[in-house]
């Protein structure tokens, strides 16, 4: 999996992969134009949409109703180091029988983004400047 992020002016960036584009910006208070979500909002969006996809897959596989399926993700900002903490995924499936609740939760906890966040990935940062930094 690979994507490219390019600075497009101000504090705005554009991520591109597989022909798709996504704008990331900051609110005016942080010097941006508020043309897109912030990086933390995008992270929570990835988690929420992944959780929603896994919940939907579970419901569809069992011919359970998915009407009104919604996912709300909240988080608190923490410091030292700066990060998001206490992330809560709230899934609502109004037409689904209550006895499916724990099974839906298990399916959500199997999602790729959930697993990535709960099992710390190895992250390597490589910086290239000058001659080595020519953008292709």
List where the protein language model places each region.
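Extended beta-strand/beta-hairpin segments
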Residues: 1-45, 53-136
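Alpha-helical metal-binding/catalytic segments enriched in His/Glu/Asp
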Residues: 50
